[in-house]
């Protein structure tokens, strides 16, 4: 499973670890992904999504039905 948020599309970023001596080594910044089940009243079932905590806040704000239509418009099967 890829480390991509289904709501925001956020994916791992690449940067550097910087030591006290300013030595730089490459590293990945991973998104804060969570797997969460949401109850969808209109479909009378649970939907499991892999999303970041920011994606959860977006669902709190817009509602699960609105977010699911956006995800399905992108072509993802949910």
Swiss-Prot record:
GO terms for cellular component: cytosolic large ribosomal subunit. GO terms for biological process: translation. Signal peptide: none annotated. Keywords: Ribonucleoprotein, Ribosomal protein. Pfam families: Ribosomal_L28. This is Large ribosomal subunit protein bL28. Belongs to the bacterial ribosomal protein bL28 family. One of its GO terms (molecular function) is structural constituent of ribosome. The gene is rpmB. The keyword Ribonucleoprotein applies.
